[in-house]
Each structure stands twice: as C-alpha cells, then as structure tokens.
Amino acid sequence: MCIRDRSHTIDESFDITSRTLNMVFDQLDENNVSLQGIVLKPNMILSGYSCSYQASIEEVAEKTVNCLSVHVPSEVPGIAFLSGGQSDEHATLHLNEMNKYETDWNLTFSYGRALQQSALKTWSGKIENVTDAQEAFIEKAKANSLATVAGL
C-alpha cells in the first residue's frame, strides 16, 4: 500500500489500496481462506506527507469507507486500522468519522505508536511521571474506544 512519507495524492492512495485489496482477496479466495475468520488490517486512504494537498478528516473517512465498500467482501467481520504514521489525534478522528458511515464490518483500531505516543512523551523516562503517563494512555484508549462507535 502507500508509504506515508511520499508525495502521493489521496486519489493515488485510493488506487493503490484498491489494487492491493483486490490482490489480497483474490489470493484469499484462491487459497480457500474463510473470510468470516479474518480481521483485515489495512491502511487508511491518506495523502502522502509531502503532498501539497492534505485531505480533510471527512475526505479521508469518505475515501477509506468507499474503497473498502468496493473491495472488501461483506463476509469479513472486522477491519482494524493501522495508524500508518498519522498523529495520534488524526488517527482517532479519522476512525471516528469512518464510524459515522453504515458499513458491513466493525471498524476498530490496531494502533501502536498512535495509542502510546502521548503516554511515552508524558513519561519521558522519569519515575515521577508514571501516574501522569498512565492517565494519558487511558485517555487515549478511551478516545479510540469512543471513536469505534463515532462517539467523539
């Protein structure tokens, strides 16, 4: 799929992701994989960091849901998004906006850095910051949990 630090447009991201999803599901079908037993972990449809036009939260959500609607079979029970180098705030807002759409799947998150970044920054390796870091992590986890039901 697209590498985030490039200059591709959101439309190029859509096209590349579409082709990739088609190949993935062709291979899953060819190998008789039960789609009811998978969780898809795709990227969101984003502009590259170096692209002069950065898509809005709403545009990212619309393009991502549209791409998935066309290329992901309804038998897939869930889609867990990677943050793909987005800021923790953008990853959460994009997920929230996508969950405003009616889809065939549960849309959730599988974030590493985007879930942990604020806690790690708050902690900064100092024992006296542990409680504040834990609170920052819980706050981010709650926000992403709310985003799975468009609750922000």
Task: Cite the ranges covered by each PLM segment.
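Short, small-residue-biased leader/transition segments that mark boundaries at the very start
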Residues: 1-3
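Active-site capping/gating regions of soluble enzymes
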Residues: 8-152
